[in-house]
Regions:
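Transmembrane alpha-helices and immediately adjacent membrane-cytoplasm interface residues
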Residues: 1-2
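Soluble C-terminal extramembrane regulatory/interaction domains of multi-pass membrane proteins
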Residues: 44, 66-69, 73-212
Length: 212
């Protein structure tokens, strides 16, 4: 258990350098640009693909790990997940650069993991959301994020309406599981996740038996 917890927390702690405190997807992209490492984000997405895959395996076979808090109170594996997924979704939807397949795979790995953990605790969500379904992020928040990217020197698509539609199409896959887990585990504050999380009573959720 400790080795799984420790591996999880190494990347959560490292993320603060890129994504700030509290972590955010916007800050992740902005800081990468400022550090002249935007072109190296492919490697970052691959690293987090692997992290999400291991998260799914460990946190559904050893469910208690979900409640093991980070050594630093302001950090959380849930809000770290949200920041990385939002960063990847913004890269895919808003940034005016060629499609980044590794960012897309990272989003898929992430929502697979969050959904699996939500399933473990009986947390409901729509397993087949459609791109037009509502999400918890407002269009104004998204447009402000685009402005922040532009201010940092990151090229953003001229058609912000189309970018918004694309962003919702990515975010809808993990929006409810992310916010639900943030509320269920009572994570520290972070934008676009625990700041608007759903509150679930632990006693009202059915937990699946631990795998043998």
């Amino acid at each position: 258990i400790y080795s799984s917890f420790s591996r999880r927390e190494v990347l959560v702690a490292q993320l603060e350098v890129r994504a700030g405190n509290p972590p955010s997807g916007v800050h992740l992209l902005v800081q990468s640009q400022r550090m002249e490492r935007f072109h190296l984000l492919d490697d970052f997405w691959v690293t987090w693909q692997q992290w999400f895959t291991e998260l799914e395996e460990t946190h559904t076979s050893l469910g208690v790990l979900s409640f093991f808090r980070s050594p630093q109170a302001h950090r959380s594996w849930v809000t770290a997940s949200g920041a990385v997924l939002d960063g990847a979704s913004l890269r895919l939807a808003a940034v005016d650069m060629p499609f980044d397949p590794e960012a897309g795979i990272c989003v898929r790995a992430g929502f697979f993991a969050l959904r699996a953990i939500a399933d473990y605790y009986g947390i409901p969500y729509d397993p087949e959301p459609r791109p037009g379904d509502p999400i918890s992020i407002t269009k104004d928040e998204f447009l402000q994020a685009c402005d922040d990217l532009v201010d940092a020197g990151i090229p953003v698509r001229d058609d912000r309406d189309a970018a918004w539609v694309d962003f919702t199409g990515w975010r809808v896959n993990y929006d409810v599981p992310l916010l639900s887990l943030a509320g269920f585990i009572m994570t520290p504050y972070a934008p676009w996740s625990s700041d608007r999380s759903f509150r679930f009573r632990r006693a009202g959720l059915r937990r699946r038996p631990t795998r043998p």
